[in-house]
Amino acid sequence: MMNVEIITGSRLHFGLICGTPQTGWRFGGVGVMLRQPSWRITMHKSRTSVDQISASSETTGRVAEFLQKIRMVLPLPAIEVSVKSEVPFHAGLGGGTQLGLAIAAAAKLVSHQRDIHNPFELAELAQRAERSAIGTVGFCDGGFLIDHGLPDTLSETRNVHRIVVPEAWRFVLVRPMSAQGLCGDRERSFFNQRAIMAESLVESLVRQIQDCLVPSIQSEKFESFSVSLEDYGDAVGRFYAAEQGDIFAHPVIRKLVVILRAAGIHGAAQSSWGPGISIPASSIEHAQSIVDRIPPELDGTQLRVDIAEPLNTGASLHSESPEMSDGQRLV
């Protein structure tokens, strides 16, 4: 029996660039893949005639939805899915996309299809990546990703560039325990209104990416990276402030960022619609020193704080099938 295990990372997205056909970068932006938190999923054919899913209540529903979508294209038998670790949804970590791509890849393997290395085909199968491609490409490649946005024509390939993040760097993740970011109908409504950034803002963000963020990663200049990331995140946040309330979506996170910046800690940026943020660190010791400055509770709101490593590879695949190499990376 084909038994497949897939372990994904999670992703940070530092804000969509809402360009136009003239400015480019429509739904482009930058983000990074993280080793933690992660999805760890096993899948094999069921011994019964119905699917069996072992996961939290919300994840069980999500997996069932993905399987329904996949079966519109793929003749998938009844399967058993066990989810052993989860990424929180609507927290800015790309949990839904990573789960969907993992289920799509595992379903193809269980159905004896080996073509799992094209992330856009997996996204189409799971009906994900409606706008951003960072989590999609990151699923297979990892790293820091520069998404140039939707191509001008359907025949063009989406341009997503990947660079390696210094392995010593870390990201401190902070999120309010009981809050979620904008999602669902509200998110679709916002983008259906054809939200467009001013040409000057698009140009400024692109310069920040090309002249500051990318060179600072490639040359491992951490201080430059953290300041550039803060500037980029603030500029994008101001564009979305009317919808989410301010540069940072959650009032407690806003207060926390003020405290951190007053202490000389730079780089705090919201991921996607939040409410979670990340703060870059140059090492595990630096990350721990940042964590030590973050209270477990602020203004009555409990904060979840974690330290995450960059993930410079794609999701990992393990299989008991002799046809697949154990520990294979989706790169």
Predicted regions and their residues:
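Conserved glycine-rich beta-strand-loop-beta hairpin in the small C-terminal domain of fold type I
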Residues: P275
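Short, basic/glycine-rich phosphate-binding loops at helix/coil junctions
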Residues: R47-S49, I103, Y232-R238
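Claisen-condensing/thiolase-fold acyl-transfer catalytic domains that form or cleave C-C bonds
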Residues: A269
